[in-house]
Amino acid sequence: MARILRASCLLSLLLAGFVPPGRGQEKSKTDCHGGMSGTIYEYGALTIDGEEYIPFKQYAGKYILFVNVASYUGLTDQYLELNALQEELGPFGLVILGFPSNQFGKQEPGENSEILPSLKYVRPGGGFVPNFQLFEKGDVNGEKEQKFYTFLKNSCPPTAELLGSPGRLFWEPMKIHDIRWNFEKFLVGPDGIPVMRWYHRTTVSNVKMDILSYMRRQAALSARGK
């Protein structure tokens, strides 16, 4: 009887979506803190060819999706979905920015000059070309992390309690707000303030629904303001 009751309780929790994953309480999305000082417009980055520094204030008034990417990850096919997302929501003000990093499983080992050819001919392959801006490879966690990632992470709670296997994570020191893996995402609103953060395994289709919902709320607020 006890075993039956336990199974029944477990099933109820599972159907309610409250059973913690084995790796520890992942959330598909977290909402960012409201009271952080500063905006993303105080920062910028070099394009992947190293030829242009782009200040993020160039994207003022847009919805900016920051994604740390890698060419040899099990999630690399998200590039295809990100291209589709950029094409679909670009006309409504979405700008996707990609930041290669080799800190998770050493899955971005090449030089900057090798990343685009790898995407085109290996993974995803088939002549793939990203339709969104990629920037130079760099650190998103640790002592040498890019400063705008410090800002994003401090603005938004992490999506998982655990960092993962230390043998596959290549940075020090490790902090609670650190990015957990390749293809974690942050949305910054038209005012330059971080809005949402997504777990790396959250599907791009779910990310799209969250962004659309936020866009609708912003449009409604603007309409009331008029």
UniProtKB/Swiss-Prot annotation:
GO terms for cellular component: extracellular space. Its EC number is 1.11.1.9. Residues 1-24 form the signal peptide. Its main location: secreted. It catalyses: 2 glutathione + H2O2 = glutathione disulfide + 2 H2O; tert-butyl hydroperoxide + 2 glutathione = tert-butanol + glutathione disulfide + H2O. Secreted in plasma. Homotetramer. Protects cells and enzymes from oxidative damage, by catalyzing the reduction of hydrogen peroxide, lipid peroxides and organic hydroperoxide, by glutathione. It comes from Mus musculus. Keywords: Oxidoreductase, Peroxidase, Secreted, Selenocysteine, Signal. GO terms for biological process: hydrogen peroxide catabolic process; response to oxidative stress. This is Glutathione peroxidase 3. It is found in: Secreted. GO terms for molecular function: glutathione peroxidase activity; identical protein binding; selenium binding. The keyword Ribosomal protein does not apply. The active site is at U73. Belongs to the glutathione peroxidase family.
